[in-house]
């Protein structure tokens, strides 16, 4: 399975050709950067989890003369050109989009943006670490150092494609970093999406105006009850009848309000969508001897400048698009952390952390497309099982790695 993934990556995406464009700032380097990038990609494809895991495989397979040492990989990551790594991601996206490997989400191309804390430590730090003071149960205060980044993904029904990330620097908030990220993504992927969804922090006039300038629509969660938009939507919901429908096991009561004059910073009218959701579930009783029926209820509100359609199913589709925001939590953060060890710090420096994350997300995108488009064996039902097959295929390969074409090492 490892050889099959390597051949697929090079045949469809020219992966081991375009990574030759990645450079670093080492002076008089004896090992080409393409060898280092190849080693990192092999580490991610085989899900080693750390540079030490890769070093053990190198020693076991007797590849010390063909793959660089982990110390060389770490030093090179400090000076890798982040822009050229992003260009590799753009090339893979263009080939995937042209081959129709990606599909729209509920009929529209939807981008989702959110932040994630990668690592937290009380003693490991660098000058780009953010810090905070936490109080333990015994009252002792500790200083935590951590790295944080904002990610932008393209939501989809089967595959969520991770487009780009931006680190959150010390002294700035998530929105400042997200503003740079959204601006760069709109420039590098101008036709990749038409809607951008964010949580309650993105209900800012600066974000809505930026997306409007790039001819994109915005959707943000409305949570703050003190906002005039919240109060006006709550009042209008009492005066109008909702649209009632069922999707799956969930029952929906949805209101769609057009409100103007309640958001002075934005200066334009917006839509506020209110959704009351009830999902019946069967759960264990408190005594643990029987089951009981319960109803999980949730009230959600979103603000958007997406124009209203006269299609009766448009509101139902818009609510589904709003729910696609969870893909960045489930398929980006949770999956990459639990399966791909995305929270592991391979090298504690700002440039290295960003480089390793971008290369990881490139590999995650390729494996996701490979599983959906190329795997015909019905016994391979989960991504975890596929990754184990790839890793075992590399571990049991008899021939040395350089004989596996077309890796240029």
Each model region followed by its residue ranges:
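A short, flexible helix-boundary coil/loop motif
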Residues: 1-4, 15-22, 245-266, 337-409
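Gly/serine-rich nucleotide phosphate-binding loop at the start of the catalytic core
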Residues: 1-68
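Short, conserved catalytic/metal-binding motifs centered on acidic residues
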Residues: 39, 54, 69, 73, ...
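Electropositive, glycine- and tryptophan-enriched low-complexity nucleic-acid-binding patches
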Residues: 133-192
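Domain-level cores of phosphate- or acyl-group-handling catalytic modules
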Residues: 172-229
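An anionic, glycine-rich sequence signature occurring as long contiguous blocks
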Residues: 217-325
């Amino acid at each position: 399975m490892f050889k099959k993934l390597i051949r697929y990556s090079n045949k469809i995406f020219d992966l081991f050709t375009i990574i030759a464009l990645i450079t670093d700032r080492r002076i008089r380097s004896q090992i080409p950067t393409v060898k280092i990038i190849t080693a990192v990609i092999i580490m991610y494809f085989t899900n080693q989890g750390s540079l030490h895991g890769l070093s053990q495989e190198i020693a076991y397979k007797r590849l010390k003369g063909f793959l660089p040492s982990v110390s060389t990989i770490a030093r090179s990551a400090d000076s890798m050109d982040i822009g050229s790594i992003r260009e590799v991601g753009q090339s893979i996206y263009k080939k995937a989009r042209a081959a129709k490997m990606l599909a729209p989400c509920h009929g529209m191309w939807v981008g989702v943006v959110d932040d994630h804390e990668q690592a937290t430590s009380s003693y490991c730090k660098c000058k780009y670490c953010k810090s905070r003071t936490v109080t333990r149960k015994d009252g002792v205060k500790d200083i935590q150092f951590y790295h944080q980044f904002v990610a932008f993904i393209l939501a989809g029904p089967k595959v969520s494609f991770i487009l780009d990330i931006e680190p959150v620097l010390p002294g700035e908030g998530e929105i400042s970093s997200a503003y740079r990220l959204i601006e760069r993504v709109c420039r590098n992927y101008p036709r990749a999406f038409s809607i951008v969804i964010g949580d309650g922090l993105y209900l800012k006039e600066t974000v809505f105006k930026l997306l409007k300038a790039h001819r994109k629509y915005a959707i943000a969660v409305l949570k703050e009850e003190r906002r005039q938009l919240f109060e006006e939507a709550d009042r209008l919901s009492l005066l109008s009848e909702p649209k009632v429908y069922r999707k799956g096991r969930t029952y929906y009561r949805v209101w769609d309000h057009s409100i103007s004059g309640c958001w002075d910073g934005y200066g334009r009218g917006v839509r506020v969508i209110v959704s009351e959701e009830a999902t019946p579930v069967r759960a264990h009783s408190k005594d643990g001897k029987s089951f009981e029926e319960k109803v999980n209820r949730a009230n959600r509100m979103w603000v958007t400048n997406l124009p209203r359609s006269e299609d009766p199913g448009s509101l139902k589709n818009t609510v589904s698009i709003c729910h696609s925001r969870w893909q960045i939590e489930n398929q980006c953060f949770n999956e990459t952390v639990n399966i791909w060890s995305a929270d592991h710090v391979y090298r504690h420096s700002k440039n290295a952390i960003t480089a390793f994350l971008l290369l990881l997300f490139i590999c995650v995108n390729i494996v996701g497309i490979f599983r959906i488009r190329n795997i015909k064996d019905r016994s391979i039902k989960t991504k975890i099982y596929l990754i184990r097959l790839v890793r075992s295929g590399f571990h049991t390969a008899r021939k040395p790695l350089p004989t596996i074409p077309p890796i240029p090492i």
